[in-house]
Amino acid sequence: MRLCDLPDGSSLQHDDGRQWDEWVGIHGKPPSWMLTWMKSRWGNVLAVLCLVAFVLVAWKWVLPAASEVVVDWLPPELEQKVGRGAYAELKKRWLDQSDLSEAEQKKWRDMFESMLRKAEPKQTASDWRLFFHKSKILGANAFALPGGDMVITDELIYMLKDQPDTVMGILGHEFGHVQHRHGIKMVVKAGMATAMFGFIIGDATGFLATVPTVLMTQDYSRQAEREADAAAAQFLNANDLHPRVMTVFFDRLIASRVAKYKEKSDPMEDFPIGFSSHPPDNERIKFFKEWKP
C-alpha cells in the first residue's frame, strides 16, 4: 500500500504498492538509491541485523545501566510491594506449606537475626522477612525477593540440618542480594526490555503478571553473584566463622545431583536458582575456600 500527502492536506492511497512504484518511476521523480536499496532483500537483512545488534547492546549494557538509575529513584515501599506480590504468586504456583514446626522455624530465624545483628548492626528486623516452604519443583533452594523477603526450602534445611553455619551463610548470601537490591534491578531491567520489545512489536501488556517468573528464571549477573558471595563471606567472618563453611553446601548438592542425574555429564547443571552458574561454581568454591579478610 502507498500513501501520498497532497499540498492541500488531502491524500492519495493506492493498495498496489508495486503498481504505484512503477507509475512513479515513469511519471514522477525516481526514488533515491537509499530508498531503493532499503526496499531490497539486502536492505531487509541489514535492517534485521541492525535491530538484533541494537537489542543485544541494549540488553548487555544500556538496560543494566538504566535500571541502576531507575532503581535509585524507586521508593522502598514500591520495591516491597513488588516483592510481596511476587511472593504471593509464588505461594500459589511453586511453594507449599512447610513441614517444619513453628518452633524450628523460629530457631532458624532467631539464629539468623542474632548473626545479622552482629554483622550489620544498623539492620533491623523490619528490613527482612524469612519464610520456610516445601517445594518439589525448586528442591533444595533459597532465594531473595525485592523488598527484603527471603525464602528457604525445607529440602535445603534437611540437606544441611547438621551444618547450621552453612545455612546461615546461604541466608547471608541471600541477604546480600537484598542489600544490593539485585531483585528489583532484575525486575526493572526485564520491564524495560519488555517496554523496548513492546515498542518494536507493538505489545507490552501483561508484564506485571510475569514478575514472579522473571525472578525465578532469570540468573543474576556475575557481578551480582560476586557481590552476594562477598556479603556472605563478610557476614560469616563477622560471626567468627570462615566462609569455607559454604563449600559444604556445594559438595552436598553436587553429590545429590550426581545421584539423581547420573546420565548428565555436568552435575552443576541443575544448581538451584540462588546459586546458579554465574560466576562458574568452581570459581565460587575457590573464593570461599581462599577468602581472607
Regions found by a protein language model. Give the residues of each.
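A Zn2+-metalloprotease active-site environment signal
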Residues: 26-293
